[in-house]
Every structure is written in C-alpha cells, then in structure tokens.
Amino acid sequence: MNNYHRGHFAEFLARVYLTLRGYHFVCRNFVTGRGTTAGEVDLIMRRGRTLVFVEIKQRQTLELAAYAIADKQKQRIMRGAQSFLQKYPQYAGFDVRFDAVLIKLPFAVRHIQNAWTM
C-alpha cells in the first residue's frame, strides 16, 4: 500500500473510530486559502454542541505520529477552523475543540481530545 492509500485508509479508520464513539460526521479535507493563509482540516466531527477539528496522523508508531504534528500545521488547522465557522454560520454557537487521532496500521488508534487550543 502506498502513502496515498495509507492516508485515505487512516482517514477512513479515524472517521469510523470516532463515529463508533458517538461523534457525527460533518466534513472531511476542508481546505481554504493559498500559501501562508491556507487552512486545512482532515476531519470535522460533531458531538452534541461541540465541533471537533481533527488532525489525523499515521506513522510506524503512535509516538512518531504524535511528534508529526508541527506547530505550523496546528496554525493551518486553526485557520481552517476559523474559515469553516465563517462559511457555515449554523455552527457559530458551538464549542470548538482540536483533537488528534494517531494511527499505527493496521489497527492501533489513539484519540487525543484537546490536543491543542487556539
């Protein structure tokens, strides 16, 4: 399996994992802007009145996956979240959270709630 297919499988696995834990799918691969103003979110889920912006990382170990989320990437995700909330005002009153789902294939998954804050 090449990196492209591993990435798509990891996104699918994260979505199923969160759905089985009571989260509802909102959007995947939300992208806005270009260059330094770009925003990007792998997965957006909802649980109650909380909108969860999820970064998914798949590596050979869960520890390597955790270290792979750089500060620049967190900034892009936060810009993506701000853009999403502006584009979809029906979520304006929701609480916002940034989570990470770490994956070691074939099936080791770790969900980190509140992985970072704005």
Regions found by a protein language model. Name each.
Residues 1-30:
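Acidic-basic catalytic patches of nuclease active cores, encompassing PD-(D/E)XK
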Residues 24-51:
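Active-site metal-binding core of divalent-cation-utilizing nuclease and nuclease-like domains
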Residues 41-64, 77:
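Conserved catalytic cores of phosphodiester-cleaving nucleases, focusing on short active-site segments
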Residues 104-118:
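Short, low-complexity, polybasic intrinsically disordered segments
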Residues 12, 33, 58-106:
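Catalytic cores of nucleic-acid endonucleases
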Residues 26, 65, 108, 112:
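Glycine-rich, flexible loop/turn motifs
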